[in-house]
Each structure stands twice: as C-alpha cells, then as structure tokens.
Amino acid sequence: MDRVYEIPEEPNVDPVSSLEEDVIRGANPRFTFPFSILFSTFLYCGEAASALYMVRIYRKNSETYWMTYTFSFFMFSSIMVQLTLIFVHRDLAKDKPLSLFMHLILLGPVIRCLEAMIKYLTLWKKEEQEEPYVSLTRKKMLIDGEEVLIEWEVGHSIRTLAMHRNAYKRMSQIQAFLGSVPQLTYQLYVSLISAEVPLGRVVLMVFSLVSVTYGATLCNMLAIQIKYDDYKIRLGPLEVLCITIWRTLEITSRLLILVLFSATLKLKAVPFLVLNFLIILFEPWIKFWRSGAQMPNNIEKNFSRVGTLVVLISVTILYAGINFSCWSALQLRLADRDLVDKGQNWGHMGLHYSVRLVENVIMVLVFKFFGVKVLLNYCHSLIALQLIIAYLISIGFMLLFFQYLHPLRSLFTHNVVDYLHCVCCHQHPRTRVENSEPPFETEARQSVV
C-alpha cells in the first residue's frame, strides 16, 4: 500500500519547547507516487468494462434476467462511487463543470486520477522548492516502545494529493461491497446453474474478487486509522500480507457458501438472505432509537437535516454490505459524535464471527443434504468441509494479526489471549470458582475480566 507522503523511519530529534509536552520536529515529508489511485481506477474501469461486455453477451443470448441483474449491480455501485467522490471533494460548492460532467457519464474516477497525476507531476518538478502555504501536523508515534509526539510541515499540494488518496480509499470500499460483492456472488451463481464459464464472465469475476479483497484490506487499514487518529501508523509487508490472506479466505468461503445455499434452495433462500441483511441494516438504527440521542449535526456544516439523514443512511447501507460478507472492523454507532466505536471491542468481533460461523455451518449442511442437482460430479461432503475449514483458517489469521502483527497492539488493554481466557473463565461454574478460590483472589480475577 502506498502513501502520498511518508515520514522518515528515524525522525530528526529536534525537541520543541511546549507548554504542554515536548514535541519532536520531524523532517519534511517525502511524497510518493500514488499507486493506490491508479490501482483503484484500474479496478473500476476493468470491472465496468467487463460488466458491460457481459450485459451485451446476455442481451445477445436473450438472457434477460442475467442481463438485468448484471447491469443493475454495475449501475448502483457506479452511481454510489460518483457520489462518494463528489462528496469528499465538495464539488457541489465549486465551479467545475468538466468534473461534474465526467461524473455524470460515470467516468469520475478517470478524471480524478488525471488530476492526481497532474498534481504529482507538479510536485515532482518543484521538489526542491519550498511551498508558500504550509500547515503543521502533529501525530503520536511509538519509537522503541516509547510514545513520542512528532510535528512536521505539510504543504498545500501534498495535502491536496492526500485528499485524492483518501477519496479513492473510500471509493474502493463503496465499489467493493456495494458492487463487486453482489456482482461476484451473482456471476458465481449463474456459472453454477448454467454449467458453463465463458471467458468474459471469468474476467468479470476476477476483477470483482480483486476489488473485494482490496476493499476489505483497506477497510482494516481505515479502521485502524479511525480508532487511533492521533497516531502515525505504518503497516509493513508482513502485516498487509496477513490481512490479505485473512480477508481473501473469509470473503471467498462466505460467498461460495452463499452461492451453494442459493443454488440449492433457489427462491426459498431469498427470505433468509434478505432477513439477514435487514437485521444488519437496522441494528444501528435500533440502538440509536433506544439511546434517545439526537441526530449528529457535525457531518458537514453545509448539510441540512435531510442531507445528514441521507449520508447516515448511505453509511448504514455500506456498513450492512460489509458485514454481510465479512467483518467491518468497526462498530457503527449513530448516537456517537464520530459515528463509530473507537474502542477495541472484542465482544463485537467475537459475536460477529460466532454468528457467521453458525450461519455458514447451517447453509453448508443445507447444501450437503439437499443439493442433489448441484455439482453432480463432486463430493458435497468434501466441498462443505473445505469451505468451513477455509473460514476457520481466516479466523486464525485474524487472531494472528491482532495478537502479534497489529501496529499498535501495545496500546491494547487486553489482547486476544486475554479475551479468550475471559471467555473460558465465564464458562466455569460459579460454585466451583467460589469453592476453589479465596474471596480476595476471586475479586481480583473478576476485576481483571
């Protein structure tokens, strides 16, 4: 994963006197080539082109339903992508007719990518010149296990390029979970019931799978940045590899189980899937209603109450789309000022994976016992076992990341092992604990838990 600008690994130790605390003056940030912007644009264009090609093929073969669903998934995600980029860049308050026109014809990511490349080339040509407009940024860093506060200057051009990067990160998540996930699931379903896989559909499924994996990986990184906004965070290649393997196994196993379950029950599977999605969708709103809190008004200063409500609904739909296929790594709380729970909520993570594991086992058992006409030449028991094992392995990589590879794991009050130990402690009968431990030790253990 690239960064628009990065801080040297060993900042120049130049303490600056402050009334509150000592600050280390960091070296000026070095801007890097925005590979993530190019990659996100490539995924968007590739998936859009392959989806439109399959729409043309389905129309030529008079397969109306397949054509309609394929085109609908493409259009919905593309429109949401355009709205996301317009919202992040605040284009409605600016006079940019060309950008708005490109968004209107669903080519907004392309023009934004060109703008980012032009900005990068401008920075590259003026690398040795000092910018007249700069701002100071302060972040905490963990250096040799010690927390230090670092301050550095960020130029206006670098900040603009960083805004492009952040916009594309959010765009990639919108595309992944509101477009690529349903597209990939549906194309897998069509391939399963039609018993043929043309090259165009393979290309579309590959683009969708890469988009989903990339979006889920970004979801983890953005979750860490949101929870630890005061810290400068670095993820090394090993951490990114662990997250990628975890997310790939989790998403592929989950989607394959959904496809096999849907192919087995046909229309009978629709109520179960719709109910599952609606529970995730309305859960944050039910908690918000029960809390009795006011609707947050700090999302955008120029937004009316209706505009704020539209943004909250869009965020909730994205949150439900993420949790339907994988863990969102964040818990949405509409009653909070920041809209998310910034705590390390092990209980929410454990509940999500426990419920999803039970769901996957149930759907796999339905496929095993009732999927007579699905995959006639394959052993259903072996397929079911492999899918459950793949999902369990993804959980193992998730636990590995949080226990050993999380960049700020030293800030955890409790880690994965502590949480599992607490769960095991609660499973013991209380009478046995009371009889085997002195009162002082019992109170101490309960306080730790």
Swiss-Prot record:
Signal peptide positions on this chain: none
InterPro entries: XK-rel, XK-related_adapter
GO CC list: plasma membrane
Membrane topology (UniProt): Multi-pass membrane protein
Pfam families, per the entry: XK-related
Domain of life: Eukaryota
Location in the cell: Cell membrane
Entry's family note: Belongs to the XK family.
Protein name (Swiss-Prot/TrEMBL): XK-related protein 2
Species per Swiss-Prot/TrEMBL record: Homo sapiens (Human)
